[in-house]
Amino acid sequence: MKILIELPTWLGDTVMVTPAMDNIISHYNKPEITIIGSFVSIEVIKNHPKVVKAEVLKKNYISLYKIAKNLGQFDVYFSFRSSFRSRIFKLLISSKNKYQFERNKYQNCHQVEKYNHYINDCLKTDFKAGKLNIKPSLNSSFNYSDPVVGINPGSSYGEAKRWYPEEYAEVCAKLSLQYNIVIFGGPGEEDIAVDIEKSLIEKGILNYQNLSGKTSISELVNQISNLDLFITGDSGPMHIAASFQVPTVALFGPTRDDETSQWMNPKSIIVKKNLDCQPCMKRACPLKHHDCMNLIKAADVLKAVQSLN
């Protein structure tokens, strides 16, 4: 059974699609999975044992046409995207059966469940959404020699989801006697990582490593999977940590924790302030005070860490 799956664009969404993808695989006899999507999404899923081919989609329509024709014939096609470009690609692809995710159809539940409901609707099944399932690189033997806390201060969604570097530094200073510190971040998030690094140096904290902007997706997965503790905002790396059930403190401000919190991680705790203006779902605070993150203090996060231990 030849199956083509178009993955979501973003890192976190791609991790959250894995329970639905596993249900697709379990439904069909001898599935051969080809995945298409953004570079980030492909890097997350390419190590899955059922994936036989992976193709990065380019943005221009000529490339879409060429890729669709070069991929050949499939028995079934599932798209986990609902964009106009994805709808065009659906028309171009050769498949006996084609299904497209409808973002507005599935509401008031976790994103993992939205993707899973979509697959149940397509297949006329009643699968439950299982655990997140991403695989470390087969070539990796990475391990930390000492207990390590990872912090992930950045966010691709916008500045409204970001907590403050001085607060992260205060948390790291308190935890530095128990843990070595690793600062994570993607391209464009190096600024906040450098601010945290400067604060740590000023506090005399030297047992840290700043990896912001320096890791591939595979390296990020391998390194997060081996952490002893993770402190993060609502982000893609947060979902990687959930996949490996890393003890996690997740800070939520403008986004909906009931939809995008860690899935099935019993070692996770959410820190948020439950303000009337939450969740606004804005990239920048429309009220100009950013209290949803500004009112979270280092003491709140340290208390959450203690509750995990």
Give the ranges of each region predicted by the language model:
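Catalytic machinery of carbohydrate-active enzymes
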Residues: 1-309
